[in-house]
Regions:
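P-loop NTP-binding core
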Residues: 1-46, 50, 55-402
Length: 402
């Protein structure tokens, strides 16, 4: 009896066909429950707190017609005003309290990056971008991870809602200006998204080909995202980039585009060892592309922190090695994040806690603490740029008058 020969190509073709049928069934099920995402709603006191004014001031603006009439919901025998974050931003604009980058400062590009997966890069980049939008800034969130988890968090189903041209690939391989065609509006008025698809992983292979290194019009493959994002700078105050858990061309492009790198680390020994290798690779990248890279600050964010003795000992080790790079705020383990993520929501988007109110409040406090510290680092980059511009102007004036 002749032994059956194993045919790997046939196996792959058959598996792809069966997988395609499975994928179509899954997409049909997803489409059936595909809903429009909305923001949480709250009362006038919370709206006033966020906007930095009093509730009476809001009422007066609405009465005079300086703001649209509020939405009302029945609350027993009375009607209650309700607002969301988008309406708070319109309120900020009406009273002159909408924040923005300083005059003379450029858009800051913040990249969440690490070689290792499972360190909460996507969780933190998503919540940081939404925090910035909640605070009133104009924000672009770039999903550079082919897993497209960030994209899914905004209600986009990559294989259903997105097609060719709806990710970074054209901007990195054809023309930097094409990045504008990939921008999607989200349910946050001041937060736009450049989504990802599984097909984006082809970018790593494409950019590593010899002919790409010889493409003078697009420039060196690792710096093309920087050039593409520069075409969007006038639109946004801050750009946030989520990266894949590897150091291929997509991650290299994100690093080369960054002003500020946030490096999440879980305080475990494997993650500490990975961080050493990460810094060695970053040093090599800087040596190769020194003129193109403009990273002005790197911050290490400890994530998934618990109170165990082992974790505390590891934090002491990390602090001894990287103390000046560590953010003072840390992101602890919280079930509220896990529960909201299972509903494809962020903590900032849920109306009611999935667990206890205390757990929810602790999660919000941790996120706000981390995000405000990262925003402070971005503001310091703005301040340094403005100061450098003033000094350059004074030096030019002194030279012209001497």
């Amino acid at each position: 009896m002749q032994a059956m020969r194993f045919n790997f190509r046939t196996l792959c073709r058959n598996a792809a066909e069966r997988g395609g049928q499975m994928q179509r069934r899954l997409l049909d099920a997803l489409e059936a429950r595909h809903t429009v995402k909305t923001l949480p709603e709250f009362g006038i006191e919370r709206a006033a707190q966020l906007a930095g004014c009093t509730a009476n001031h809001i009422r007066n603006l609405e009465t005079r017609g300086d703001l649209p009439q509020p939405r009302l919901v029945d609350a027993g025998s009375i009607q209650r005003r309700i607002y969301n974050y988008n309406e708070v931003n319109r309120l900020r604009a009406a009273i002159g309290k909408r924040p923005s980058r300083p005059a003379g400062a450029s858009c800051v590009r913040i990249v969440f990056s690490n070689l290792k997966g499972g360190v909460a890069k996507t969780t933190m980049s998503l919540h940081f971008a939404q925090y910035l939008a909640r605070e009133g800034y104009r924000v672009l969130l770039v999903d550079a991870d082919p897993q497209a988890t960030t994209t899914g968090a905004f209600g986009f189903i990559p294989d259903l809602d997105l097609g060719d041209g709806d990710d970074l690939f054209p901007a990195l391989t054809e023309a930097p200006e094409l990045i504008a065609h990939a921008i999607k509006q989200t349910h946050w008025d001041s937060l736009d998204l450049i989504p990802a698809r599984l097909a984006l992983q082809y970018t790593d292979w494409r950019l590593s080909q010899p002919e790409e290194r010889q493409n003078d019009s697009l420039g060196p493959p690792p710096v093309r995202l920087h050039r593409a994002l520069k075409t969007l700078e006038d639109r946004y105050d801050l750009i946030v980039v989520d990266t894949p858990p590897s150091l291929g061309m997509l991650s290299l492009n994100a690093i080369a585009a960054a002003n500020l790198i946030v490096m999440p680390i879980v305080p475990h020994m494997y993650d500490i060892s990975s961080s050493v290798q990460y810094f060695r690779i970053l040093e090599q990248i800087c040596a190769l592309y020194e003129r193109e890279i403009n990273v002005q600050r790197l911050c290490i964010l400890l994530t998934k922190v618990d109170g165990s003795t082992e974790t505390l000992n590891n934090i002491a080790v990390i602090n001894g090695a990287y103390g000046e790079l560590l953010l003072s705020n840390r992101m602890g383990l919280t079930k509220e994040l896990q529960k909201s993520a299972s509903d494809q929501l962020s903590i900032y988007e849920i109306d009611q806690p999935r667990g206890s109110r205390d757990t929810y409040n602790r999660a919000i406090m941790m996120l706000d603490g981390v995000n405000s510290e990262i925003l402070l680092a971005a503001r310091q980059i703005w301040q340094q740029e403005v100061l450098s511009g003033i000094e350059a102007g004074e030096a030019h004036h002194a030279g012209a008058t001497s």
